Amino acid sequence: MPRRKQSHPQPVKCEGVKVDTEDSFDEGPGALVLESDLLLGQDLEFEEEEEEEEGDGHNDQLMGFERDSEGDSQGARPGLPYGLSDDESGGGRALSAESEVEEPARGPGEARGERPGPACQLCGGPTGEGPCCGAGGPGGGPPLPPRLLYSCRLCAFVSHYSSHLKRHMQTHSGEKPFRCGRCPYASAQLVNLTRHTRTHTGEKPYRCPHCPFACSSLGNLRRHQRTHTGPPTPPCPTCGFRCCAPRPTRPPSPTEQEGTMPRRSEDALILPDLSLHVPPGGTSFLPDCGQLRGEGEGLCGTGSEPLPELLFPWTCRGCGQELEEGEGSRLGTAMCGRCMRGESGGGGSGGPQGPSDKGFACSLCPFATHYPNHLARHMKTHSGEKPFRCARCPYASAHLDNLKRHQRVHTGEKPYKCPLCPYACGNLANLKRHGRIHSGDKPFRCSLCNYSCNQSMNLKRHMLRHTGEKPFRCATCAYTTGHWDNYKRHQKVHGHGGAGGPGLSAPEGWAPPHSPPSVLSTRGSAALGATGSRALHTDSP
């Protein structure tokens, strides 16, 4: 057969190739190793046919492809028969060098004569047989390697992403690189800072599609939407509580199906009597309010101290009327007899509508909420516990938010600004109250007359005129009033904390600091003309 020669010579480096001799060679020349670059010239030839010249070592071939003697289906196996020239061989004999390239390890299937297949990249075994490649990759290919898990060494945090672990480690190091430009707030995450800035701007991008509710946090919106989710369930026959949708319960276990063990429903997590339960003998939840009702106890537990004086009267949850002694004590419903008869007469045994639809209610006052943490925070107003104290003054509060709001009094910070006027304040509620001055809105209306105002405090003060109650009494004289501001101004007459001293006259002492002088003189003369000398000691109606 004609042989094709290579047209362009190429340098080939053969390192670590051991050159073996023919049978006629001795063992010394057989250890020859070629480590230099040989420039192959016109002697490089490619042999394409089967080996025809067996035993003929005097050919001029340098590299060829020898077919397996058995002729199996694995194809050609590369060989390295080198032919040297007469000058290089010395004796005119050809050297045959066979490659000692390390063959891949045979699997257990190949050892038994089976055809080799793809191996697992993790365990090295056949694909699909090991425990690490049982599922297989997408499309039936090789299995995908398992996803890495980045775990925290200080806590149980685990994530598939290293960036999440780096962000989490800032909670342990205390690093807070994201700081608010308007207040001392700082956070370890940018998303928290973005949520915080909405407290300064008043932005509420998350709105409920079912009601006018809007908030600045997506979590608060999802929590609110639970009140609209699903049809309302039937009310509880004992307390009237109703939830938005029933919770899915797990299937009963075999012991529960046989009746050997009572089944515990998931709804058992809901408080059955709309009150905060305190375990018997344990008051660590509210250390200063051990008289709260526990399991199986009445309103006052045995051996406990009497209840402190309430901050406001016990009122009915249905109509708001003040309850008499003995009313509302049945199951802590806080309902008057008329509302209870109305509920029973209507054929329903549920509680009143309105605040009672909320799941967690205070047993000492009409407060009710959907969230147990709000109830726990509210109970501090009854126990008198104030763990949050100001470092600059004796101020203390039961809520951390109130302390933060109070600290702005010392710093002079006023982050909330009115867009219509130069007004600024340190409380968002004050800004909303101020906005009613521009809008003219007066949402607080008296149910006994046509009076309306834009502040709830003014309505409470106005209601004292209908009831005639004057709770503020002077300890020095017989002066009584229903307004705390008037009481403080009256104390200046006696020289208690007033800058004007004891010589301050009564009409001037009653004057509000924000009222114009003409109104003050008219109000003072009218009070003196109506009540005479008694106007010095009694507030005008």
UniProtKB/Swiss-Prot annotation:
Any Pfam family? zf-C2H2
Per the record, residues carrying Phosphoserine are 85, 96
Among InterPro entries, the record links this protein to: Znf_C2H2_sf, Znf_C2H2_type
Q: Zinc finger regions (C2H2-type), where?
A: 150-172, 178-200, 206-228, 360-382, 388-410, 416-438, 444-466, 472-494
Where is it predominantly found? Answer: nucleus
UniProt-recorded Gene Ontology molecular function terms: DNA binding; transcription cis-regulatory region binding; zinc ion binding
Localization recorded for this chain is: Nucleus
Record flagged with keyword Phosphoprotein: yes
Question: Looking at the UniProt record for this protein, which Gene Ontology cellular component terms does it annotate, in alphabetical order?
Answer: nucleus
Transmembrane intervals: none
Q: Where is the composition biased (Acidic residues)?
A: 44-55
Extent of Basic and acidic residues compositional bias: 103-115
Q: Where is this region: Disordered?
A: 1-120, 492-541
A single Gene Ontology biological process assigned to it is: retina development in camera-type eye
- Domain of life the protein comes from: Eukaryota
The record, for PROSITE patterns, names: ZINC_FINGER_C2H2_1, ZINC_FINGER_C2H2_2
Q: Which UniProt keywords apply?
A: DNA-binding, Metal-binding, Nucleus, Phosphoprotein, Repeat, Transcription, Transcription regulation, Zinc, Zinc-finger
Known function? Transcriptional regulator that plays a role in retinal development and maintenance.
Assembly, in brief, is: Binds DNA. Can associate with the proximal promoter regions of PAX6 and SP4, and their known targets including ARR3, RHO, OPN1MW2 and OPN1SW.
Similarity-based family: Belongs to the krueppel C2H2-type zinc-finger protein family.
Q: What is this protein called?
A: Zinc finger protein 513
Species assigned in the record? Rattus norvegicus (Rat)
